[in-house]
Design a protein with these regions (language model features):
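Conserved hydrophobic/aromatic pocket- or pore-lining residues that grip, position, or stack substrates
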Residues: 84, 130, 149
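Conserved P-loop NTPase architecture
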Residues: 1-116
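A short, flexible beta-alpha/helix-coil linker loop
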Residues: 25, 173-174
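Switch I (effector-binding) loop of TRAFAC-class P-loop GTPase G-domains
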Residues: 102, 109-115, 134-166, 174-187, ...
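Conserved active-site aspartate in kinases
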Residues: 169
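A conserved segment at the C-terminal end of the G1
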Residues: 122-140
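Conserved C-terminal guanine-recognition region of P-loop GTPase G domains, centered on the G4
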Residues: 1-16, 158-164, 185-249
Length: 249
């Protein structure tokens, strides 16, 4: 991948080159509505950018370096690295503050004896629709990838136990999600990690349903969420043909 990028940079140094992660982050950026979400995207983008800085410097070095001198590429690489490290540190520091605030909120809920439910699932599976139905809220529902980036918390009353329960809607997952993205969004995903119950929303009309269920379950394993907490919620049953419904039943 980096060899191909170097060829592009050598021909047109100012050209923008995106890989799969860049594309995902570009979509994320369109849906970021809070400072925390924006910082998480920036951190993931910088983590993905880091390995490329050396390659960019090598291209510039071949273009402007001379024998026995420090090439212009080497100088630029050092400058880019320093700038990259400073940005990374700033983003991590700000996210650490957000994570601390979120932990205080979760600890406060626990001290009050409030139980929590987290809604997870593959992107565009219908998590926010379920959240709206359960909480009677009207958060934006889109037929789009990654429409939810932030963790939104609401509450529902459970007559059977006579208590209110908190419920959170979280970011949608995707196959082959890079570890850097999971790490960057860790503070948001903490709502799921500390939840008493995790509702795994599944689009039952999706031909790739089985594979996507496996993707979500794998990410939950990475987050060390016990399987005992996970409950499947099948969505979009109305979009399944009658014959398929018979097979499912």
């Amino acid at each position: 991948k980096f060899t191909l990028m170097k060829l592009f940079w050598a021909a047109k140094p100012n050209i923008n080159i995106w890989d799969r992660v860049d594309l995902i982050l570009a979509i994320f950026s369109r849906h970021a509505k809070t400072k925390e979400a924006t910082l998480q995207i920036e951190l993931a983008r910088m983590q993905n950018m880091g390995p490329r800085i050396y390659g960019m410097g090598m291209v510039l070095s071949r273009q402007g370096g001379g024998v026995g001198t420090r090439g212009i590429g080497e100088t630029n690489t050092e400058l880019m690295r320093r700038h990259w490290k400073a940005q990374m540190k700033n983003a991590k520091d700000e996210l650490a503050k957000s994570a601390a605030t979120r932990k205080q909120q979760m600890d406060h809920r626990k001290n009050l004896g409030l139980q929590t439910i987290s809604i997870v699932g593959y992107t565009n599976a219908g998590k926010t629709s379920l959240f709206n139905i359960l909480t009677h809220k009207k958060h934006l529902v889109e037929n789009a990838l990654f429409a939810t980036l932030d963790s939104t918390v609401g509450e529902i009353f459970m007559p059977s136990i006579g208590k209110k329960i908190l419920i959170s809607d979280t970011i949608g997952f995707i196959a082959n999600l890079p570890p850097a993205l999971i790490e960057a969004f860790k503070s948001t995903l903490m709502e799921s990690v500390h939840a008493d119950i995790v509702l795994h929303v599944i689009d039952i009309s999706d031909p790739q349903m089985i594979d996507k269920v496996a993707v979500v379950s794998d990410i939950l394993d990475q987050l060390k969420i016990p399987q005992q907490k996970e409950i499947y919620v099948f969505n979009k049953i109305d979009a399944v043909a009658n014959l398929d419904k018979q097979k499912i039943s």
